[in-house]
């Protein structure tokens, strides 16, 4: 087991390295002169040269990349062009809102999606199954920002039940913190719930058709015992896999959701950086999100043995 973990960790290094090189190269792939674009129309030649030097555009690509990668390994993601503050500091200041939104969405999505997927498979062809499938198709088809505006209009404007925008830190109270996250989590979590529920249903249908499940029924076991101890346990690996893959949906959805609900998180920081062409921030955020995605899927791979002891490393 330990040897497998070490090999997988070593295998992630070139993946993250390639991602880092691609992220760093974005600046050089930008059409035109990035320094002139950032400086604006009224900038002087000296201003453009200063920005070019700050971005390292006056140096060859590979030497600049090695210098940047070495700094990243020491926790230095560069300096923001517009605020002149370290990118690491700017990201660190916005971790809590993004982490709160992502964790709330993930937990609620799993707690809702897995049960309704199991029930839909158990009652295949019935009304509940059709409703779950209808929700899955609709939830996966509606863009996050469209659903967000619908929820804002319904629950914040018409019913006046929930606040529209902003974020309240957890230290100011659990309910104020949670109240600000309900609408964003609903908007972001719907597509995630739809995905997990659909995969759970499909996997459970396949497992419920197996001989050992029919044998468990023949022995007179309670339906709940058959579902939980025999069917769901053996369907866990594909479900856990799609939960890990769905982290990409969370990462991309966070950017849109934070922009709509004016949450001062990493997603909102990314949008502002894109608008202002603050490349060091864009590079730092993309590298951070890519690394998180790789590590989450590594953790998912390592967790398979917990759900299926037959898997050997």
Give names to the regions the model predicted:
Residues 2-4, 95-130, 144, 157, ...:
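Alpha-helical transmembrane segments of integral membrane proteins
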Residues 3, 7, 63, 67-71, ...:
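Short hydrophobic helices that act as membrane-entry/anchoring signals
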Residues 6-16:
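N-terminal signal-anchor/signal peptide hydrophobic helix marking the start
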Residues 12, 20, 42, 110, ...:
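Residue-level recognition of pore/gate-forming positions within transmembrane alpha-helices
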Residues 15-66, 82, 159-180:
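Hydrophobic alpha-helical transmembrane segments of membrane transport/permease proteins
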Residues 17-22, 103-107, 150-151, 287:
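Hydrophobic alpha-helical transmembrane segments of multi-pass integral membrane proteins
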Residues 22-29, 66-70, 134-165, 187-192:
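Membrane-water interface segments at the C-terminal ends of transmembrane alpha-helices
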Residues 58-114:
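An internal, D/E-rich "acidic patch" concept
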